[in-house]
Amino acid sequence: AAPVVSHVPPQRPALPLHPNETPDLRRKINHWADFYDLPRPLVHRLAIRESTHNPHARNGPYYGLLQILPATARSMGFQGSPSDLLDADTNLKYALKDLRGAWLLSDGDHGTAIKWYARGYYYEAKKRGMLVETGLRDG
């Protein structure tokens, strides 16, 4: 008899969870990373840097998993109260929209994307003529 050939691609084993990360949080991070076409490792690196995967983190005026300023979230379309940014999905929706702009300016470099996310990238986007692409100006 001929050997049976499987047409199912092998499954890659799931990466272990990061400290403080839950399976539910992993699912949310992956969903929003994919939604904004961002590399998942970049988003996890940012979550580790900003809050060690803690959606309820607060540091001065910064809120949530990715430590976004309410004013920055508002510039990305957020209309809630600052405390709403302590919800992981809400934080990811607006912070990753911001990270998407930083990623577009990073030339594919994770460290550069995080640098632009942390310090802001309006003037760089303006210099490159990318205000619309980065979400900083309506098209």
Question: Where are each of the predicted segments found?
Answer:
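Non-catalytic cell-wall polysaccharide-engagement segments
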Residues: A1-V8, P19-D24, Q79, S83-L86, ...
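Extracytoplasmic/secreted proteins, especially bacterial periplasmic and envelope-associated proteins
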Residues: D24-H31, P41-L42, Q67-A71, T90-G101, ...
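Short, functionally critical alpha-helical segments immediately adjacent to catalytic or ligand/cofactor-binding
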Residues: L38-N54, A95-L96, Y117-A118
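Solvent-exposed loop/turn segments at secondary-structure junctions
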Residues: S51-N54, T72-S75, G120-Y123
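A short gly/proline-enriched turn/hairpin at secondary-structure junctions
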Residues: A57-N59
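Substrate-binding/active-site groove segments that recognize
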Residues: P61-F78
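A glycine-rich, coil/turn loop motif that links secondary-structure elements
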Residues: P61-G64, D84-A88
